[in-house]
Amino acid sequence: MTASDIQPTEPHTPPTPHADTRLVDRTKLSKMYQHYVEVKDKYPHALLLYRVGDFFETFFQDAVTVARELELVLTSKHGGEVGRVAMTGVPHHAWERYTTQLVEKGYAVVICDQVEDASEAVGLVRREVTRILTPGTLLEEGMLKSSRNNYLAAVVITSNHWGLAYADISTGEFLTTQDSDLERLTQELMRLQPSEVLVPTNAPDLGTLLRPGETSPHLPECLPPSFCYSLRSQQPFSQAEARSTLLQRFKVRSLEGLGCDHLPLAVRAAGGLLEYVEDTQKAGQVSLQRLRTYTITDYLIVDNQTRRNLEITQTVRDGTFHGSLLWALDKTSTAMGSRALRRWLLQPLLDIKGISSRQDTIQELVTNTRLRQDLRHLLRQIYDLERLTGRASSGTANARDLVALADSLSRLPELANLVIDAHSPFLKALQKVPPILEELAQKIHAHLVESPPLHLKEGGLIRPGVNPLLDERKATVEADHQWIANLEVDERARTGIPLLKVGFNETFGYYISISRAKADQVPANYIRKQTLKNEERYITPELKEREARILTARDDLHKLEYEVFVTLREEVGEQAEAIRHLSRAVAAADVLCGLAELAVYQGYCRPEMVNGREIAIIDGRHPVVEQSLPAGFFVPNSTQLGSNEETHQLPDLIILTGPNASGKSCYLRQVGLIQLMAQIGSFVPAKSARLGICDRIFTRVGAVDDLATGQSTFMVEMNETANILNHATSRSLVLLDEIGRGTATFDGLSIAWAVAEYIATEIRSRTIFATHYHELNELAGMLPNVANYQVTVKELPDQIIFLHQVQPGGADKSYGIEAGRLAGLPTVVIQRAKQVMGQIEKHSKIAMGLQNLD
């Protein structure tokens, strides 16, 4: 036979592991995999993590997804008669880290944990779903941002009305509202930035979690695409079932006390949301605060465009916290205070009484330096009471959480003593510490060791003297450990091997370790168990017999410790409402204390809030830009707006002109931010301020193409302008920058003129209109409630100096060519631009046309 007679054979390759449960004969799966598939069938749109020993494993198609998203190795396991199935897994002690990544990517994750000891199981270890994690239902500290709420929202929409409910299950906050304006629904969602929005539907793919940008024909068109939506069954959102859910949860006979009895859509949204929360939190009931009802128009409305343009929570350029208004104002000492400040900024007040109450507190803290400093010192020692309580009430808190909670509760009596002579209701609220919370803190400290381990079922949690039976078991375990120590000493003496050691690991249990060089001295009764590079490991019958007793005693001890801890945790959960009530008081005091600190060090004034339309700011400053510059570098400017019977001489509309890069946009934002700060109760960056309440702040500052909807820069600008003209009132503040610049000069000027004229004559909102159309200065001579202001410059023979000062009068130049020169345009381009500008100015017909306007 020659080599050419030999037929080549295919190389052996193992069969591809199964990755699709639909293609598998389930009767041929082993029992564990059959159970896995049964659980998976109940949650087809979630990723299932299934506890197997020390790992959470996932199989079939979920294994492929998890391996891809987490960049893990995709492997396989024997699944019974079907052969191998796709598998990947993560260590059980690190499940939070991996699950966080999956949830951040928009996945729902189901945790199926072992609920009995594997050593005691008869047959298959019993497993149950203990948690369903979705973007809006997170509780774990490592999964949440401490400085902001993690909202779950639910919406119910009919032809002419909508209901909205939202909750942060980590803090217990739970609110609902109802309205008829769909634009307000969009703005509320943009304000809340919920991590997940529940939408009732008859869709066949119920349970689907739509990640941001994903669409579904079952999703109402009015909902913005930037959120994660969960399609839910309509049944929990029905009027009858939602009402029943709320009545049962809050143990009331009527919804009247919750303020939503007359709001059917608000009830449906709240009931559906509550049912979803209870369904996802399998291990324990989340403690939500009593449902509160609110009305959107009870607060200053700040739409998404204004939040963006004023950079309230993040910058426009790169979306960062640093450089935002929140960054400039946040001098809080606690996570609760930081979240509260964010909420205040996104929902300013309209009520002068409420604003004044906050101002009074700041005034008291500004005046009383010692109180402010001592208060801030104590607040820094308080942990996140809201979220610690949330984890305790839901059964997810560990021992370190309870110790942190007790440490914080122990500080509350000190806070109460500190504010004993305070006058402000916000500070007096800190005096009301229920004795039961002091007792609870003492009990936690008496039960738990000072620095408990992270894991609850490995012992070392409970102090001696707490439980007699526990002390007995500890003594037994300690005696066993002493027996092991004595064995090591005795065996060293008996064998003559001085480096003999008795060790332990979870795989082999107890063993005797001897270096390989001393192997010839090993006694005959030693049984070799393992050979390593430099040592041999042995066991003896006596050691293995004792090991069984030791491990049983250890496990009994750990179980009892865990039971004692769970009882203590449940006691904490029973006081959740009392703790949260105090935590809200701490958060408010923290915000006001931080604002007082800011007022002192930045030289802020207390604004006078009035019911009229006046906006009178003397030497105002931009709160963010000022902090970004060296002290004293910011140029302050005043603002006078808002005519009424008392201030009829003040204009309703200011035409603001001036050079490029002179500070017009900064001035616009400055006025808006000062008004916003005043309406959250803060002091403001100015020498003095007298401010009428605004019902809404509108801004139109800058524009970019909206590629998602195919809108040009100019069309975006026109849409935003139309929104302002259709919704602004005489009590609104409107800040407009460069209306009409996105089209031809004549078109742009005409639109800008008409918009300014309409606002001044029809709406009469307080408005600053920044423009390079100097022709708009003519409006001041035609309309009595319009005034011209300019940002001044100093002209030198070869350059201009920006003075950044806003003064009465209209500018007649934009100095755009000079700005181009400063930016580095070639000299030849600058010279040519001057020639062209001279010709255009000589032959312009715009001025002549304006003279003929009616």
From Swiss-Prot:
Gene3D superfamilies (alphabetical): 1.10.1420.10, DNA repair protein MutS, domain I, MutS, connector domain, P-loop containing nucleotide triphosphate hydrolases
Per the record, which residues fall in region Disordered?
A: 1-21
Q: Which cysteines are joined by disulfide bonds?
A: none
* Molecular functions per Gene Ontology: ATP binding; ATP-dependent DNA damage sensor activity; damaged DNA binding; mismatched DNA binding
Domain of life assignment = Bacteria
List, alphabetically, the PANTHER family matched. Answer: DNA MISMATCH REPAIR PROTEIN MSH1, MITOCHONDRIAL, DNA MISMATCH REPAIR PROTEIN MUTS FAMILY MEMBER
Family annotation (PROSITE patterns): DNA_MISMATCH_REPAIR_2
Look up and give the organism this protein is from. Answer: Trichormus variabilis (strain ATCC 29413 / PCC 7937) (Anabaena variabilis)
Q: What does this protein do?
A: This protein is involved in the repair of mismatches in DNA. It is possible that it carries out the mismatch recognition step. This protein has a weak ATPase activity.
- What keywords is this UniProt entry annotated with? ATP-binding, DNA damage, DNA repair, DNA-binding, Nucleotide-binding
**Under what name is this protein listed?**
DNA mismatch repair protein MutS
